[in-house]
């Protein structure tokens, strides 16, 4: 006997199905209607029978897409966000506050007054001070063209230190300049002490003392487990000359090849102690000047001194010291490949400089 087409199809499907049927079907035990008529009530987290109202399941999770805010959604004053703003680790408040919504018509003035009164009552004074300081730090970093990572590191250092008793009596400018210098050291962004000093009206001695205090505070808090900051870059002393060279070469319009040659000179000048005791800026200026002479570039020592904020005599004196050890500080591959020649370097003497024959 042949089976109907529908029955044969069901038999074929059941024959292909292997293993247990894991489909979960929720049905009402009271109504016993199939297919069941159930309703998901996400507001209560329940699944109920639409016929008798019996709760079939509870504590369900709403898997639908969340409300989203688009650029033009605030035209009517509505904000669909239900989770509030993201927490800011640089502030101390928990950011859990009640916000009074906007009203239309005659109630607008009342809600505005309520918002003003509430803001005065719940504002955290400490957070206000931190935000004002962060705004000043951001402005100073922007003036020095520092990247965002330096700003964040400086703000983190400021938050850890600004309430310390040992900083009482120190000016805010000296503290901010010091934390910016800390941020530069942590992010390995080359900035000299003189460049940071130019952002403030504070004496160099005061910033130096404040920087030492902040450095000790951060190291102590890190050792005690109150902070997780790598202080190795902060406590290593002066920034190396090689970190300044790429930026100053860029300001002078020099190529990468010249910058690399200057970095090589600055790095290997330490091996012969030819410029021992000189500041990193002085070493960088002398190395850049020597590299420009090697490549026969028309860059005067006056221009280099103005760019690096040193005297012209400092540039020439540094070059004179490097010239005496030129075979040890200049990259030998440049000479061997014929890219540059020793004759390109002006010969120096105690009296004057003259061109080598």
UniProtKB/Swiss-Prot annotation:
Write out the residues that bind Zn(2+): 28, 31, 49, 52
Instruction: Check the UniProt entry and state the signal peptide residues, or none.
Output: none
**Database matches in Pfam families:** TFIIB, Zn_Ribbon_TF
Q: Where are the zinc fingers (TFIIB-type)?
A: 23-57
Q: Which GO terms describe its biological process?
A: transcription initiation at RNA polymerase II promoter; transcription preinitiation complex assembly
Extent of the sequence repeats: 140-216, 248-324
Its name, as the record gives it, is Transcription initiation factor IIB
* Protein family (similarity comment): Belongs to the TFIIB family.
Q: Which gene encodes it?
A: SUA7
Q: Which InterPro entries match?
A: Cyclin-like_dom (IPR013763), Cyclin-like_sf (IPR036915), TFIIB (IPR000812), TFIIB_CS (IPR023486), TFIIB_cyclin (IPR013150), Znf_TFIIB (IPR013137)
